[in-house]
Structures are given as C-alpha cells and as structure tokens.
Amino acid sequence: MKLFLDTNVLIDFILERQPFYQAAAMVMSYAVEDKIQICVSSLSFVTTNFICIERCKMPIEIFRNKINFLREYIEVTSVDKTDIYNSYDSLWKDFEDGVQYYSAKRANADYIVTRNTKDFEENDIKAISLDETIKILKKYRENTNNP
C-alpha cells in the first residue's frame, strides 16, 4: 500500500500538533515497520520548512533531525512542469492541491492522506483523513497477517 501525505499531515507530524500528531505518528510507524510506503511531494517539504522554521520558529536543528529521520522512510516525489500545467489547466479550486494530486498520481499512490479531504473529492485517488487511514491500516495489517 502506498500513501501520499498532504502537506498538513507532514506539518502535524513534525510540529507534533495536537490533536493530529498521534494519528500522524501511527501512520509513520507503519512505514518504519516496512508495512506500507509513504510518499510526500518535494513541494510539501519546501512548504513544511517554511511553516516550521519561519512561522512557528522551530529550531533548525530539531527540524533537521526530524527530516533526517523521515528520509529513511519516505519517498520524495518530484513536482515537474507537467504537474504544474495540469493543475493550471484542470478545474482544481486550489492550485497547490492540484499539484499535490498530480504528484501523487505519478507516484501511483493508493490514497492521499489529508486533513482536507473535501479539497481532493473529485479525482481518481481517494482522499482520506488520518482517522480513516488508521482504520484502513489496521484492516491492511489483519489481511496481510502482519502483527
């Protein structure tokens, strides 16, 4: 199973934002245990860096440590001109969400995990909340006989 994390989920995990952190950490734990694949767009890392360091004043050493940890478990998907043009040419209300969608599509993600599922309603990759993700992962674990 391959999950594409939207920027808000990555930020929730890195900043340990409540009440979202526990669910985000649980999703990450599945990747650490090699049960699933997680991908995040390069755009999300740029935005997350800005939010965490510039807006929230997270010390850069702490931010770098968290990113270094994630590097082992997350596939970074590229954003290319096709994603940009497709997002502009499509009917996406939010340009950034469109870019994320096209990056997830090229990565062959099964789901987009986001706190804003309504932003991704009309596409062929199902957008799910963190709570829905946990339910799906528990069923996935049962079906694959993983403890």
Per-region residue spans from a language model:
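Short active-site alpha-helical segment characteristic of glycosyltransferases
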Residues: 100
